[in-house]
Curated annotation (Swiss-Prot):
Interacts with PP2C53. Interacts with PP2C50. This is Serine/threonine-protein kinase SAPK10. One of its GO terms (molecular function) is protein serine kinase activity. GO terms for biological process: abscisic acid-activated signaling pathway. Residues 23-279 form the Protein kinase domain. The keyword Membrane does not apply.
Amino acid sequence: MDRAALTVGPGMDMPIMHDGDRYELVRDIGSGNFGVARLMRSRADGQLVAVKYIERGDKIDENVQREIINHRSLRHPNIIRFKEVILTPTHLAIVMEYASGGELFERICNAGRFSEDEARFFFQQLISGVSYCHSMQVCHRDLKLENTLLDGSTAPRLKICDFGYSKSSVLHSQPKSTVGTPAYIAPEVLLKKEYDGKIADVWSCGVTLYVMLVGAYPFEDPDEPKNFRKTIQRILGVQYSIPDYVHISPECRDLIARIFVANPATRISIPEIRNHPWFLKNLPADLMDDSKMSSQYEEPEQPMQSMDEIMQILAEATIPAAGSGGINQFLNDGLDLDDDMEDLDSDPDLDVESSGEIVYAM
């Protein structure tokens, strides 16, 4: 253990003790309710990886376990690759593929909005990754621009990340809780009944497509973007419009209209999206067949960490580090909710977490 690698930063209660024998710190790349994310370099081969550190103890909860188990099973070019988990004296470290291109969200913020062709280029990759997840019986449940990363290539490859809210129909029951970020949540999820997570993912993909094309969220009131109650009402009523200044093809409008359908039974499905004329236009050959993509993604690296080893590490990670105590307060991740949440605080049905994600009590 490299004691010189003891560090503390935002989003952490106690300093991280790195596994200095295997990875060396390059820099911090993010922080939030989960803890902190760091860019690290493998001492064995010099490869850059992203490492998500979560403090040992109570924070190693069901969401963390679900994220690791589901993420471990997924091997696809449009999904951030899970590598391994490591237990340090202070934290659980989740080692993942590093996407050097940053968030798709940042790219849109810089561009304002995308052309229809550019939006389609990224949407095709998003649907390819989501389709693969669903084929593995995993629904993501928190698809959003902030959870889609890009690699560093000239024509960036999109990478889905953050499986903390994902559910597997093999390992878990039908989704019932309301999770996700307000702007992306499907109507049936807000109704607090059992729902098909795969169809709910379709809605979230539609929100992502709309934001790429328009540069704004479809169901937010532009005058009151932080008014979540109004956003929720507009979602339930499917109240959206495409501004006059946004020029998109009739085929694109048709696809959006078939995604934004309140009744999940009549909403377009992922397989139907993949056969839609707008989606098929200029579709890269490597996105046409999931089986070919998966076979192309066989990696000659170290064998996958066994489930038994992972479960043992997770069990040990629930034991708090010796001498753990508050050094830093958590900093809010994502949306800044301080100003406009007073009216929601009094609602007994709502639990609005500081990350900007809404979880309805069941």
